[in-house]
UniProtKB/Swiss-Prot annotation:
Disulfide bonds: none annotated. It holds the Pfam family DAHP_synth_1. GO terms for biological process: amino acid biosynthetic process; aromatic amino acid family biosynthetic process; chorismate biosynthetic process. This is Phospho-2-dehydro-3-deoxyheptonate aldolase, Trp-sensitive. PANTHER family: PHOSPHO-2-DEHYDRO-3-DEOXYHEPTONATE ALDOLASE DAHP SYNTHETASE, PHOSPHO-2-DEHYDRO-3-DEOXYHEPTONATE ALDOLASE, TRP-SENSITIVE. SUPFAM superfamilies: Aldolase. Keywords: Amino-acid biosynthesis, Aromatic amino acid biosynthesis, Transferase. Its EC number is 2.5.1.54. The keyword Glycoprotein does not apply.
């Protein structure tokens, strides 16, 4: 009989189970407390009970644990300085959606060479999340793969569904099961309605099929996630201006949803020019100063060194510089946080 299945499978390997990974990289009670407390604070910001500003800031993607932890230590000092006005959460992205092809993140390919040592990558990612949370600094990530969350979601205080997957039914179902607040980005073309629809979908109960913590395929029934929100990330044109925020808030209001939202300073809003994140920050700071309650949070791409670099086989990488999207450097990151903290002082 002719074989009819797995005709295009090149390799199959065994993946560590979530309990085995958790046993190798356990969560302490103090870290668990840090995660749950941060989730509660973020939820209060997203419902308008807390008028501070959520700031999700960090590298486009993480590829070097040492540089990531140094960045986290610096950021944590600023978190403590501004905690009366800003809820600073470190962007810790281990999965990268690609428009066509490219490096898909530290979990998939930790050695940056196409060897796909996923078991090693997922261990590095989990330990790094533990180390960052141990500082007292909460972490945020994008949930892209439907299985990866089983390995790291217990360490995440805020999650995002990206522009390419906001309209995906399975990602909306996954968001309904996640224990943290989840932001949905508008589409790559700027369509905000798909993010509003995603929030509505994620608030509902869903049934979907997924492996459980032991790897057994399971029928999941979710209770829904009440803390979904829109992330304005730009599209064919930027959408961070006051008129854009008002239009998005009106779309949310039409369905009796909380009108608080997050503005991404990068991607379409900075026209893919990383330095323009500072211009976006200045405009959004003015909205906050003017008393806008709709701007509940912002996202910023930032690392130790400005810009980005290509991975070239046999050549060393610049320490602390992104290998995906270009980022603000540390000095500009300090400036943007000071600017936002000062703006929030006017609305508290």
């Amino acid at each position: 009989m002719n074989k009819t299945d797995e005709l295009r499978t090149a390799r199959i390997g065994s993946l560590i189970t979530p309990p085995s990974l958790a046993a190798e990289h356990p969560v302490s009670p103090a870290i668990a407390d840090n995660v749950t407390a941060a989730r509660k604070r973020i939820a209060c910001i997203l419902t308008g009970e807390d008028h501070r500003l959520l700031v999700v800031i960090g590298p486009c993607s993480l590829h070097d644990p040492k540089a990531a932890l140094e960045y986290a230590e610096r950021l944590n000092a600023l978190r403590r300085r501004y905690e009366d006005r800003l809820e600073i959460v470190m962007r810790a992205y281990f999965e990268k959606p690609r428009t066509v092809v490219g490096w898909k993140g530290l979990i998939s390919d930790p050695d940056l060479d196409g060897s796909y040592d996923v078991n090693r990558g997922i261990g590095i990612a989990r330990q790094l999340l533990i180390d960052i949370n141990a500082l007292g600094l909460p972490t945020a990530t994008e949930f892209l793969d439907m299985v990866i969350g089983q390995f790291i979601a217990d360490l995440i205080s805020w999650g995002a569904i990206g522009a390419r997957t906001t309209e995906s039914q399975i990602h909306r179902e996954m968001a309904s099961a996640l224990s943290c607040p989840v932001g949905f980005k508008n589409g790559t073309d700027g369509n905000v309605q798909i993010a509003v629809d995603a929030i509505r979908a994620a608030r509902a109960s869903h049934m979907f099929l997924s492996p459980d913590k032991l790897g057994q395929m399971t029928i999941y029934q979710t209770s829904g996630n009440p803390h979904g929100h829109v992330i304005l990330r730009g599209g064919k044109q930027p959408n961070y201006h006051a008129s854009d925020v008002a239009a998005a808030a009106e779309s949310l209001s039409a369905f009796n949803l909380p009108q608080q939202l997050v503005i991404d300073f990068s991607h379409g809003n900075c026209l893919k020019q990383h330095r323009r994140q500072m211009d976006v920050a200045a405009e959004v700071a003015e909205q906050i100063k003017a008393g806008s309650q709709a701007v509940a949070g912002v996202m910023i791409e930032s690392f130790l060194e400005e810009g980005n670099q290509k991975v070239v086989s046999g050549e060393p990488l610049v320490y602390g510089k992104s290998i995906t999207d270009p980022c603000l450097g540390w000095q500009e990151s300090e400036k943007v946080l000071a600017l936002l903290a000062e703006a929030v002082s006017h609305r508290l």
